Amino acid sequence: MFQKNISLQPLNTFGIAATAKKFSEVRSVEVLKEIVSRHKDLFILSGGSNILLTKDIDKPVLYLNTKGIEIIDTDEESVWVKAQAGENWHEFVCWCLEKNFGGLENLSLIPGNVGTSPMQNIGAYGVEIKDSFVSLEAMEISSGKIKTFTKKDCAFGYRESVFKNALKGQFIILNVTFKLTAKEHIINDSYGAIREQLKSDKIVEPGIHDISKAVITIRRSKLPDPNEIGNSGSFFKNPVITSSHFAKLQAQYPNIPSYRSVSYTH
């Protein structure tokens, strides 16, 4: 079940040459449940884009590599898509675009895997996963039981979720379900950089594929390919301030952009 002294260099986007003294690549929920029943203190590794390995890992490393994307429901306007945790995020977005499903195009080229996307409510260019998130299934490490989490259960905020706070380290996310548009797509080109790129591409009436292409072009102009130069993608948080503080700034700078954070209400 576990291999010994496995290099983690190809499994983290910085390309750090750390070693796992005990390593298991998990491709099924059944195997995961068996491991969790025997080991509680695990190092969970997914897409490897939000970690910086500084030394070899002594505790057992569990590399979650479950695959699968399926359409679980549809109606006239929407489609519900479930993706397993080990699916590469950008490849999942591309799969949705190939099917002409809208809602995730602004999140193109973000490194990492589907399973970790809800943990910090990943977002870019005016869109967060909570906007199309329906639910996820996760395994409780202490009991091995599988629980379904709704959007409300996840307590999404600005780069926040319950899995970074109250339930940190207690669950392993197994799959995520999204509700996407099947037609009548809602285009989000609110960011100036996207509008400028669309203008440069001579796109007057952009569709979801145009938005994705613009985002990819912008991201590639800012960040190197992690396969060539190790990096963790665009990694930052905008400042979170009080409403009264923002009011003062807005009085001085009327056009200052802002975003109301549901996780901060003071």
Task: Walk through the language-model features, giving the residues of each.
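Anion-binding (especially nucleotide phosphate/pyrophosphate-binding) glycine-rich loop
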Residues: F2-L136, E140-S142
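Conserved small/polar residues in nucleotide/adenosyl-binding loops
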Residues: T265-H266
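Active-site-proximal loop/hinge segments that shape catalytic or ion-binding/gating pockets
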Residues: F236
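Short, conserved charged micro-motifs
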Residues: V31-K33, I186-I187, S244-K248
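Short coil/turn segments at secondary-structure boundaries
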Residues: N227-N231
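FAD-binding subdomain of flavoenzyme oxidoreductases
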Residues: S117-I218, P224
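Long, low-complexity interaction regions most often at the N-terminus
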Residues: A251-N255
